[in-house]
Amino acid sequence: MSDDKKLIDDSPIPDTPVIPAQLQVDAVIQVRCHKDIDCFNACCKNIDIMLTPYDIIRLKKRLGITSTEFLRLYTEPFEFGRNSVGGVKYKPKEGTNECQFVTEEGCSVYEDRPTACRYYPVGLLSTRRQDENFDRASYALVTEDHCHGHFEDRKLTIDEYREEQGLIDYDELGRGWRQLILKVKSAGPAIGNMSKTSLKFFFMAC
């Protein structure tokens, strides 16, 4: 099995639509999202969005509430991976899988939207070798039937796409959190599954 395929297979999301190939920042992709596209808002109707600590800070400031209030109203804890790594993700509108911030005009918190929303339909893949103390970033293309942005007549590099979507600061400020996730995951079965108390502390760190 190739390293690319193994990395995709290890994804916490089953049946992932990610194309199993690691791309670098100079890779050229074809994608464009805009209000006039026929799939506008489709990606916001079936969400599974993990949030970083920086995402939470941006959003709670945007909404004018505390972190505690934001976590209670807009998120839910979850575990992923073989070692039950903890995290928080968007809580959809009750009875649906739709984002609480989506409107007919688009995202109501667009300027402060989370990292995952900015990247879509590109995925950030962070890896860390056992003999290294830093993470390596690569990227993958996400192809889902509802997204027609891949058919738009525009090509750009992943680095250009990241800059366009305001991801440079998000990636830099989220690096410590990604390294923490990788460290917990790389500990493997030596630490066993995280206890309920450990998960609570992990959520607090997030």
Where are the regions that the model predicts?
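Short loop/turn segments that flank or connect secondary-structure elements
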Residues: M1-A42, D48-C206
